[in-house]
Amino acid sequence: MTRIKICGITRMEDARAAALFGADALGFNFSPESPRCVTKDAARTMVCALPPFIEGVGVFVEQDPREIIEICRYCGLSVAQLHGSRYSEEETKLVLEGVRVLKVFRPETDFTPAAVLRFREATGVSAFLFDTYRPGMEGGTGEQMEGSLAERIFSGLPEGCYGVLAGGLNPGNVREAVQSLRPYALDTASGVEESPGIKSHEKMQAFVQAVRAAGER
């Protein structure tokens, strides 16, 4: 079954609704430049209110590994999602000392799954998120990845690697993405929002229903 992560949660009512509708994980953004940024205390309160077996994911952009571990431990987050060129193999290993890692790639047209294998062998990380590449942006483009590039990535992932698809996913297009790429998980933020950080409960429910319906075929 395809897992679902709803990212950019900023309000308790949205966290509870996402869990009720069937999301498997919720993302909390700690990048100060993001319109979806939350404080540590706010994230901790929301994570503590989640039902069992729903994971909290911390989203970080170019932040210090020690800060990441401290935030994840304080908030009760089980995964750190790492955006940015800072997170080399060595920097990623430092984060892994305290929390599991979801490594983000923003692949350009010449990207190949061999880069994923190299990173896994060097660090032990097995979960990778692929988001649409746009110069100067670390995610949140609201645009889908080019189809042939996405197909090349997800069809060529090494055994034991878990691919998460992000970028422009919404209730209207996610079913096709599931059926054509069969990703391990999907990540959506703006595709289920009324405005940045304010989720539409109707869109979240429709997104989850579309993913589940696609998986039944």
UniProtKB/Swiss-Prot annotation:
What this protein catalyses is: N-(5-phospho-beta-D-ribosyl)anthranilate = 1-(2-carboxyphenylamino)-1-deoxy-D-ribulose 5-phosphate
The record's Gene Ontology biological-process terms are: L-tryptophan biosynthetic process
InterPro entries, sorted: Aldolase_TIM (IPR013785), PRAI_dom (IPR001240), RibuloseP-bd_barrel (IPR011060), TrpF_fam (IPR044643)
Pathway entry: Amino-acid biosynthesis; L-tryptophan biosynthesis; L-tryptophan from chorismate: step 3/5
One Gene Ontology molecular-function label = phosphoribosylanthranilate isomerase activity
EC number(s) reported in the record: 5.3.1.24
Key words, A-Z: Amino-acid biosynthesis, Aromatic amino acid biosynthesis, Isomerase, Tryptophan biosynthesis
A Pfam family that the UniProt record links to this protein? PRAI
What is the similarity comment for this entry? Belongs to the TrpF family.
Protein name per Swiss-Prot or TrEMBL:
N-(5'-phosphoribosyl)anthranilate isomerase
Which species is this record about? Chlorobium luteolum (strain DSM 273 / BCRC 81028 / 2530)
